[in-house]
Amino acid sequence: MVSVSEIRQAQRAEGPATILAIGTATPSNCVDQSTYPDYYFRITNSEHMTDLKEKFQRMCDKSMIKKRYMHLNEEILKENPNMCAYMAPSLDARQDIVVVEVPKLGKEAAVKAIKEWGQPKSKITHLIFCTTSGVDMPGADYQLTKLLGLRPYVKRYMMYQQGCFAGGTVLRLAKDLAENNKGARVLVVCSEITAVTFRGPSDTHLDSLVGQALFGDGAAAVIVGSDPIPQIEKPLFELVWTAQTIAPDSDGAIDGHLREVGLTFHLLKDVPGIVSKNIGKALFEAFNPLNISDYNSIFWIAHPGGPAILDQVEQKLGLKPEKMKATRDVLSDYGNMSGACVLFILDEMRRKSAEKGLKTTGEGLEWGVLFGFGPGLTIETVVLHSVAI
């Protein structure tokens, strides 16, 4: 007779969850940030709001973003004028777009990750899909399973409406799945399309305007598994430790509400302050067990909610400017793609590390941190261990 403890022992993997491949994708429509205010105020029939346009121009100039990618183009917006108004009923039109395009963009990223992984997709045992762009039943996880031709009995997890901390959430869940199911290979996909949040300007809702200056579309996919097969699977980063916490005294700091007008969001001015005030505690809990207190000695992947958050975190911790380079590069080239951002940054970091001939996937360093920040205010922390190149 086999005992339950023996069954549990046999079910568990031996090594830590490991990222085995990364893929990213964006829509083909690229938007230049320097000319975006002209386009945005024209397409939303708001050119008469000259003072607000100047304010929006300053927001775009200070955003540290050079370009973004958006599924919504002029043709689509002209066909859906209610999406261009500030608060017109438009949820049906938005939903019609995202329920199709979110899984499609996710598929593009997933195909790249599966190709890099080099294993047949039939070996994928679990699927985690995450999006804040629309909701549907069956969900985007089901649609992606069909689009990719995954096995019908793949174990699916659909995470809707998590917001910008979700890149950390999906890695935390993938780690638990990979380490507790021997031989599991988890496909993780974050896909975001701003069709749910795009709307015209209002001088009474400036936090909405901040979002119009920052948000972009993108999808990222990773494959996570423990005990990589030697010579066949190539590890990139090990997921060593994870945590999630709600920052104290942060109620209402970041809110999103799905309404007839689409997804509205509200930001308190002091979001960067709340993040920087709580980051030290999160780092201490993560790295004190490793006897690491010099946060310039680790590599950094932080959700680029906006330049002010990164600036205040750097200042609070005394980080060298190069620590946030990969993070700032992704913000500059793609904007804020919500949960997908940190996975884009992982991809950027391992590529640049290889190009520069560094010793590890983590800029030549051994240990690193990945942070997600989002509604709550919620902070996700992931301790990463890099792999020798």
Curated annotation (Swiss-Prot):
Induction notes from the record: By irradiation, elicitor, infection or wounding.
Pathway of action: Secondary metabolite biosynthesis; flavonoid biosynthesis
GO MF entries: naringenin-chalcone synthase activity
Catalytic reaction annotation: (E)-4-coumaroyl-CoA + 3 malonyl-CoA + 3 H(+) = 2',4,4',6'-tetrahydroxychalcone + 3 CO2 + 4 CoA
Keywords for this protein: Acyltransferase, Flavonoid biosynthesis, Transferase
InterPro entries xref list: Chalcone/stilbene_synt_C, Chalcone/stilbene_synt_N, Chalcone/stilbene_synthase_AS, Polyketide_synthase_type-III, Thiolase-like
Superkingdom to which the source organism belongs: Eukaryota
Top EC group: transferase
List of catalytic residues: C164
Gene Ontology terms describing biological process: flavonoid biosynthetic process; polyketide biosynthetic process
Transmembrane segments annotated in the record for this chain: none
Entries under SUPFAM superfamilies matching the protein: Thiolase-like
Enzyme Commission no: 2.3.1.74
Family statement drawn from the similarity comment of this UniProt entry: Belongs to the thiolase-like superfamily. Chalcone/stilbene synthases family.
Record's function text: The primary product of this enzyme is 4,2',4',6'-tetrahydroxychalcone (also termed naringenin-chalcone or chalcone) which can under specific conditions spontaneously isomerize into naringenin.
PANTHER family: CHALCONE SYNTHASE 7 (PTHR11877:SF62), HYDROXYMETHYLGLUTARYL-COA SYNTHASE (PTHR11877)
Protein name per its UniProtKB record: Chalcone synthase 17
